[in-house]
Amino acid sequence: MGMRMMVTVFLLVVLATTVVSLRSNRASDGRRGIVNKLNDLVPKYWTECCGRIGPHCSRCICPEVACPKNG
């Protein structure tokens, strides 16, 4: 009887650990999706290119007020 109880407890622990792991992975995927959507809404090189020409930017992509012409 003791061995059967230990096996049952072990299987319950494994099952609980698996469920918690799967749920946390799904939650992190959701957060990653939200972050990716936000990144798509904001121009990729906004800070690198604002007010000057950067390595990935051929023109200023900020509004005129926030992007004074340099020289």
Swiss-Prot record:
Q: Name one Pfam family in it.
A: Toxin_8
MF (Gene Ontology): acetylcholine receptor inhibitor activity; ion channel regulator activity; toxin activity
Keywords attached to this entry: Amidation, Disulfide bond, Ion channel impairing toxin, Neurotoxin, Secreted, Signal, Toxin
Keyword Acetylation belongs to the record: no
After translation, the protein is modified as follows: Contains 3 disulfide bonds. They are not indicated here, since framework IV presents two different connectivities (I-V, II-III, IV-VI and I-III, II-V, IV-VI).
**Endpoints of the signal sequence:** 1-21
Where in the cell does this protein reside? Secreted
Tissue localization of expression: Expressed by the venom duct.
Membrane-traversing stretches: none
Which positions bear Asparagine amide? 70
GO annotation, cellular component aspect? extracellular region
Residues cleaved off as propeptide = 22-44
Q: What family does this chain come from, according to its entry?
A: Belongs to the conotoxin A superfamily.
UniProt free text on domains? The cysteine framework is IV (CC-C-C-C-C).
Task: Quote the protein name from its UniProt record.
Answer: Conotoxin Bu24
Q: What organism is recorded for this protein?
A: Conus bullatus
